Amino acid sequence: MGILKKTIFIGGIYGLGVYIGAVAWRLRKDVLNYESRQKSDLLIPNSNSISIYNQIADKYSRKITREEIFSGIYFLRYFLLRNAKGDVLEVGSGPGTNFPFYKWKKINTLTLVEPAEKMREIADARAKKKVPPNVLYRQFADLRQLPPNQSYDTIIQTFCICSQEKAVEQLNNYRSLLRSDGRILLIEHGKGKYKFLNRILNAYAESHYESWGCVWNRDIEQLLEDSELTIDSCKRFNFGTTYVIEAH
């Protein structure tokens, strides 16, 4: 390696070290500032989430697709959602993010529930291109709008607990809508396995919520335990912050 290349290489390593050090210093400063304010109560999502999702609807898919490919979440969606079959209910469906992951030959009906109007509009437009004509497609703004006495073979929810004010009540509703041999498939994010990471999530939870309508540090395991669901499996990824759950 020539002198010039060595100089560039060493300079690059030095610059990267300075950058990482600056980021670490900023994180530490923000965490300590947050903890010095003694905010012991974790943020709980509220109805403002809907207005936030309406505001970010147009950029939502573009933004999360890049992040999910990088973090591996894209592939978690692929391997979990291919198990959906029969009459499928997806709650918090957003702009139709999960359409590419469904095995349509296994699906008879697809019912979406999405409270954000802008997200519903995008999903309806995508459904015309993505959902096969032999699959009955419907969309509602609220679970209470579902046809009476309706039940489902598969209930899907991906990254929704973070924006649900009454998450346990919502999970319990799914059990009442599930057929006796049905499955509930969830991908969620929340509190991680490591204290240092959770301190960072806590410090930035409020600003992240204001931008994305998402409380990213909720205790997912505790919420599941408080619900009436029977958990068949719960696998965690990304330092424990991403949860892949199968339940009934």
Swiss-Prot record:
Its main location: mitochondrion. The keyword Transmembrane helix applies. It is found in: Mitochondrion inner membrane. It holds the Pfam family Methyltransf_23. The chain crosses the membrane at residues 7-25. Keywords: Membrane, Methyltransferase, Mitochondrion, Mitochondrion inner membrane, Transferase, Transmembrane, Transmembrane helix. GO terms for molecular function: methyltransferase activity; mRNA m(6)A methyltransferase activity. Its EC number is 2.1.1.-. GO terms for cellular component: mitochondrial inner membrane; mitochondrion. It comes from the Eukaryota. GO terms for biological process: methylation; mitochondrial gene expression. It is an enzyme of class 2 (transferase). InterPro entries: Methyltransf_Superfamily, SAM-dependent_MTases_sf. It is a single-pass membrane protein. Probable methyltransferase. Belongs to the methyltransferase superfamily. METL family. This is Uncharacterized methyltransferase C3B9.04, mitochondrial. It comes from Schizosaccharomyces pombe (strain 972 / ATCC 24843).
